[in-house]
């Protein structure tokens, strides 16, 4: 099964995207992180931002199913609060600069309600998928 950490894209514009992830107690990562107090690993919240940003990166690409985004760099990553079962993650990404030569730079913010839980600036490259 693919590791999908976005349930739905709820809005997409020229330079931004908004996604949603309903965090349930059935997520595999909760088994060991932590059994007594389940917390979604922060790196998986960053991954959810990345997956949402991938939709923005590929939205204007012809035949997007033939391409992937691979992350090159993360900067200014801040973990502000924990994410627990029952939370709904709102994932917002905004282009920092126009996409050039397949390089995408975005600022992402993950929210639970109105509270910021993770922030990051990320850079990715768009590459043709090898078949």
PLM regions and their residue ranges:
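Hydrophobic beta-strand-centered segment that forms part of the acyl-chain substrate-binding groove
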Residues: 53-92, 117, 124
């Amino acid at each position: 099964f693919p590791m999908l950490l976005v349930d739905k894209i709820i809005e997409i514009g020229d330079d931004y995207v908004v996604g949603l992830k309903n965090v349930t107690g059935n997520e595999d990562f909760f088994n060991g992180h932590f059994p007594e107090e389940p917390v979604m690993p922060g790196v998986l919240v960053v991954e959810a931002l990345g997956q949402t940003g991938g939709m923005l990166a590929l939205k204007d690409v012809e035949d997007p199913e033939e391409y992937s985004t691979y992350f090159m760099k993360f900067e200014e990553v801040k973990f502000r609060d924990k994410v627990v079962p029952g939370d709904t993650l709102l994932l917002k990404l905004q282009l920092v600069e126009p996409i050039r030569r397949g390089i995408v730079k975005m600022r992402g913010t993950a929210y639970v309600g109105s509270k910021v839980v993770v922030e990051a600036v990320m850079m990715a490259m768009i590459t043709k998928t090898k078949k």
